[in-house]
From Swiss-Prot:
Presence of the UniProt keyword Cell inner membrane in the record: no
GO BP, one annotated term: cell adhesion involved in single-species biofilm formation
Name of this chain's protein: Major fimbrial subunit
Endpoints of the signal sequence: 1-20
InterPro entries, A to Z: Adhesion_dom_fimbrial, Adhesion_dom_fimbrial_sf, Adhesion_dom_sf, Bact_Fimbrial_Adh_Pro
GO terms under cellular component: pilus
Family designation: Belongs to the fimbrial protein family.
Primary gene name: hifA
Keywords for this protein: Disulfide bond, Fimbrium, Signal
Main location class: other
Superkingdom as given in the UniProt entry: Bacteria
Locations listed in the record: Fimbrium
Organism the protein comes from: Haemophilus influenzae
Described purpose of this protein according to its UniProt entry: Mediates adherence to oropharyngeal epithelial cells. Helps the airway colonization process.
Amino acid sequence: MKKTLLGSLILLAFAGNVQAADNPNPETKGKVTFYGKVVENTCKVKSGNRDMSVVLNDVGKAHLSQKGYTAMPTPFTITLEGCNANTGTKPKANKVGVYFYSWNNADKENSYTLKSTLTGTDKADNVNIQIFQENGTDAIGVADKTIDDFTHKNNGSTNSDKPTKNHISSATALNNQTGDIALHYIAQYYATGMASAGKGPTSVDFPIAYG
């Protein structure tokens, strides 16, 4: 009898906790809605571009003596291949490019440039790498894990399936292209302060992105 009563009390307590969890204060709960789309016409990164190196020429530290100074713009190209046309009714992309991101190397405090991965005495202090679109005037902000350009917050009951900012770099119209697509970019040194002599390697990841 005692065991039965004890079990009943435990069940009642558990049920009460579940009910409290199901009906929390509105200010202590929320919901995240995720949007996405899979498209029919897709491309591949050309094999020689999947793990590539871009070498900037040496530069004198006097050219990078103050924050915001830049030097040695260097072009590089990422080539896509194997793009398949979509002539049917399935969802298709109208443009293609790449999305630059780095959870470790993006420097939020310095225009989302790329900070050096080197440590020790060989490192060039206060020197980052900045990426530009092909025109050389539109800087590409490398996305990091704090960026919220994909998130709509406090917008009432209406959600949006579009990001607040476009992060598809060098977006090129697909138009059912099946050949190679060359995406052109520019990399350059970017001073975050008075530069010192040394090396400044860094890296960035990119998946293909569609729009």
